[in-house]
Amino acid sequence: MKIELLGLASVGAILCASTGLAQTPTLNVLTYDSFTSEWGPGPAIETAFEAECACDLVFTGAGDGAALLARLQLEGMRTDAGIVLGLDTNLTAAARDTGLFAPHGVTSDFTLPVAWDDDTFLPFDWGYLAFVAQKDTPPVTSFRALADSDLKIVIQDPRSSTPGLGLLMWVHAVHGDEAAQLWTDLADNIVTVTPGWTEAYNLFLAGEADAVLSYTTSPAYHLIAEDDDTKTSWAFDAGNYLQVEVAAKVANTDQTGLADRFMAFIASPAFQDVIPETNWMYPAIPTTLPAGFDTLTVPAKGMLLSSQEAADVRDGLVEAWRTALSQ
């Protein structure tokens, strides 16, 4: 009998422990790989949010930003994500059409170069696309000058990468109906096309290309983290394309309250102060930028297609790009 009582007590302890674990709510956030990396914003944001939510915040990487949309379209209502973080305005119209997202209910004074009134997609950072190169590389200030040069570049695939898709929108915004010819002329300059930003940037750092498609903020990483001021970005005369990255709440999440809390957290200093020195982008709300950001290239002009226009032209631009580079 004594042995049986001990056994029951042990089982009771295990059940209590299991119940305690089960009561810890979990919020799943689907995002891009670099956000979850040890050098990305994910770890610091996870620590900060868990300290105030008594929850488990789980980030899941799904490739680069554009791959998020493909995964959502595949999973539909079966997704276990409560938050999707890492789409941009070139994808939000298509994402909205999935019917997966609910209004975020967050109000904030955003520091974006464009007006923002979207009640579903909440901006968490932004930046200008640009080609990043060594300072001693002769700069170019237009796509035409780049195509006419001997410079070698690395870009990202627009089907899986938001910077890659942004480049297509940028070329389209500048060259319109002549964009397909521009891609044909650029083909000789392109060393390779990578699935995502990380692979492309690493090839540039390895000396495989003269320049890489990235952001005007990318040199800040080298300056601040490595004390290296040898990198720069190029402002184009016609303007540089703007990227605004967003988060959204999944409508059918079983952690509605926690998801709402995290969406509000995104627009707080605890989240936003992490962005400049981990995601190396501009924060979406007023905050103090680190020393070194004041040295960055600031384009004289920014350009951004509306989310609906981007959705309308996306497939055609991707097909024209694919055709030009396969010739």
Task: Locate predicted features.
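Gram-negative bacterial Sec-dependent N-terminal signal peptides
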Residues: 1-21
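Extracytoplasmic ligand-binding site segments that recognize negatively charged/polar headgroups
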Residues: 26, 30-42, 63-67, 79-209
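Short alpha-helix C-terminal cap/hinge motif
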Residues: 43-59
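A ligand-binding cleft/hinge motif common to bilobed small-molecule-binding domains
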Residues: 90-94, 205, 209-230, 279
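Periplasmic-binding protein-like
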Residues: 114, 127, 183-187, 193-194, ...
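A bilobed periplasmic-binding-protein/Venus flytrap-type ligand-binding module shared by bacterial periplasmic
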Residues: 130-137, 172, 243-256, 274-277
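Mature extracytoplasmic/periplasmic domains
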Residues: 250-304
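Extracellular/periplasmic bilobal clamshell ligand-binding domains
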Residues: 292-327
